[in-house]
Amino acid sequence: MKKTNKGLTYKDAGVDIDAGNSLIEKIKPYIKKTKRPEVIADLGGFGGLFALQSEKYKKPILVSGTDGVGTKLMLAQNLKIHGTIGIDLVAMCVNDVLVQGAEPLFFLDYFACGKLDISIASNVIEGIAKGCEISGAALIGGETAEMPDMYKNDDYDLAGFCVGIVDQENVITGEDIQIGDTLIGIASSGPHSNGYSLIRKVLEIQNIDDKKNSSVIRDLLAPTKIYVKSVSELMKKIKIKGMAHITGGGITENIPRILNPNLMANINTDTWEMNPIFEWIATHGNISEEEMRKTFNCGIGMVLAIESKDTRETLEILSANGEKAWEIGSIIEGSGGVNYV
């Protein structure tokens, strides 16, 4: 009898198109919850369609941001907690867009893996959709890439992309910041999504198994805070001169990004409550204060520069919108850096 040679298939090479299609069907309910009126196409097209309502703006400016979650992803994968890492991804992007004064409009994600596990992928994307709900951004598309040999079977990586909008006259650049302005710090939920290569080194030194669900690991996996709604409410009543999202580089590197070169941030480190996880990291890793401040947010996820007369009202508005916030310093004459007192 003559043998029939069916030949190789894409699935034989490790790429399962049917699994990808099943994933799309599974995540549609999550994505539906993020839909905005401007979204004019369902998931599955070659591109996401979004009708820009430019008539609402005098001179609309689009603001874009893209980011990942760094090696925090490794902790989530090792512990098999996949539901919150998607919130981190959205937060890292929308918070960056927010600091320009923009409203996040839509979000797209990139999910790459060695072998597509529908349960894991849908759990991650459910978290992404949750982050989009919190921030008000529509999840209008994404890419799922199954790449055998590029990644181990259980490994996956994430990237996100966000677009927001702001009227040109309302763009926040930091150009108006002056000597005497007040700096407001808004609390973080933990390390957010930065400094995890150093954190993992501390865990290694302390022989802490990052595959076990300990209180330390849970604290380290707390999702990054999304500041969109609280800060958007604040912007309706208070002129924010500058905003710094405290990410990689910590307080030391991020505040100077919004300052003119003749100004300096004078920060009083006794003014806010530091999350205990940072003291744990510093103590168990024998990490200096200087290194902590230029690596981690140290309890402050967002810094706002405002006129000093608006300090009390700013703190009241942020508190009313569920944020812990403090007056952490002021602007002084200097050379563009941060002075700690």
Q: Where on the chain are the PLM-derived regions?
A:
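N-terminal amphipathic/basic leader segments beginning at the initiator methionine
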Residues: 2-37
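Glycine-rich phosphate/pyrophosphate-binding loop regions near the starts of catalytic domains
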Residues: 29, 35-189
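Short, glycine-/Ser/Thr-/acidic-enriched flexible segments
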Residues: 55, 68-69, 163-165, 189-191, ...
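A generic structural signal for residues located within well-ordered alpha-helices
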Residues: 15, 19, 85, 194, ...
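Acidic, glycine-rich loop-and-beta core segments that form the ion-binding/anion-interacting portion
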Residues: 179-214, 218
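Buried hydrophobic packing segments
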Residues: 27, 49, 93-94, 199-202, ...
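Glycine-/charge-enriched secondary-structure boundary and capping motifs
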Residues: 2-12, 120, 124-138, 151-156, ...
